[in-house]
Design a protein with these regions (language model features):
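Surface-exposed loop/turn motifs in large extracellular/passenger domains
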Residues: 1-50, 54-97, 101-183, 187-254
């Protein structure tokens, strides 16, 4: 349960004067509904279990400098049955934190467009998390940096983009994804496809996984760099694409 937001934006546009916003524990900086825009803020600093921008049945636009969280279970942007367009940088370091969360049960397709840079670290922290029983399309044009996972359990990995099963989620990556040791760049168990365009760059460290895909299709373009395997741990080889359950991989990468 979140406390009342600092700003309530309904079918409106709010333009700040490069202000900084500090969000208390369990707080929300801006709650948005309808066609709304929140622009020109400088830095949103998140407390524990707090949210920078919360969109509900909205087509929201987020244009600022940085959303940053270092405490547990913070959320940069939450979209519930919403379209999201974000150009702000997001940096999350607290355990079980999410840069952008989108849950869609609306029955209509929702679009998530991110051009901001995302940097994540911490146990079970995810850059962009997608779930729900209705379809979504994600287009990432920013750079995503997934730092090393320090937890020994793979279930606690740090992940750049995660698509849960339950609906068709198509992920299109045009940007650079840097995957640290034992981490995952894109992890999709939805019915949709993962596409890396010809502008995409995927860098995978030792013991890392670039793209993990269950079923569907991976259209791999751009450039993929996989580090040499140095670790002596069992089953720890770095992988550009790891596919299971009949996934089709179309490889046009360099």
């Amino acid at each position: 349960t979140y406390s009342d937001p600092l700003l309530f934006i309904n079918n409106s546009k709010v333009t700040m004067a490069q202000n900084d916003i500090n969000v208390s524990d369990n707080g929300v900086a801006a709650y948005m509904s309808g066609n709304s825009e929140f622009k020109n803020w400088n830095r949103i600093t998140l407390g524990q279990k707090s949210v920078g921008i919360y969109g509900n049945n909205s087509s929201l636009v987020s244009e600022g400098t940085l959303i940053e969280g270092t405490l547990q279970k913070s959320r940069g942007i939450i979209g519930v049955n919403s379209n999201i367009r974000n150009s702000a940088s997001i940096k999350m370091a607290g355990e079980e934190s999410l840069g952008i969360y989108s849950g869609n049960t609306s029955g209509t397709l929702k679009n998530i467009d991110n051009s901001g840079n995302i940097e994540i670290s911490g146990k079970k922290t995810v850059g962009i998390y997608l779930e729900g029983n209705s379809g979504q399309t994600v287009n990432n044009r920013g750079n995503i940096t997934v730092h090393e996972t320090t937890e020994p359990d793979r279930n606690n990995s740090t992940i750049g983009i995660y698509a849960k099963d339950g609906a068709t989620v198509n992920i299109i990556n045009e940007g650079q994804v840097n995957v640290g040791k034992k981490s995952v760049g894109i992890y999709s168990i939805s019915d949709g496809n993962v596409t890396a365009t010809n502008t995409a760059l995927l860098n995978v460290s030792d013991e890392g996984i670039g793209i993990y895909k269950k079923g569907g299709t991976v259209n791999l373009g751009g450039t993929v760099n996989v580090a040499d395997h140095i670790s002596s741990a069992n089953d720890s080889e770095p992988v550009g694409v790891y596919g299971i359950d009949g996934v089709s991989i179309v490889n046009n990468a360099n």
